[in-house]
């Protein structure tokens, strides 16, 4: 079946769904509308989909640290969220990338690999395709991250490493603290 044959591509569930509903699948040049269609060894399966989106481009300047045909790495400043919200926010990193693509006449997708909180600054990797996003997200646990944090209270050392689980501070949506119920950073 087509759906079994494409498993070798390790497509994300979301991308496979997008291909089935909004894209095109052909087997030996013939368009297929049923993922359960039988295929044989040697059949040529072609998957087509669009990276177009309805993101509103913005003129927010970007601090680009690296770019190639597959990805974009942006230094996100404080006060910016990654994705547009249901309330219609257009001052997000995704909107800024859409604006950059429009100005540079780049036709690519906008797929952030991970998110940083609104007030957290740092590098954000943006894949230019859904397949690239999936491939990079599989290596998520191999990415080294280092955070610099402001702390309050008495500290024995001027600098150091906090290697403890962190979680949200009670009643605060964007403040974090060391806590037994937290997660490893």
For the regions a language model picked out, list residue spans one by one.
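RNA pseudouridine synthases
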Residues: 1-185
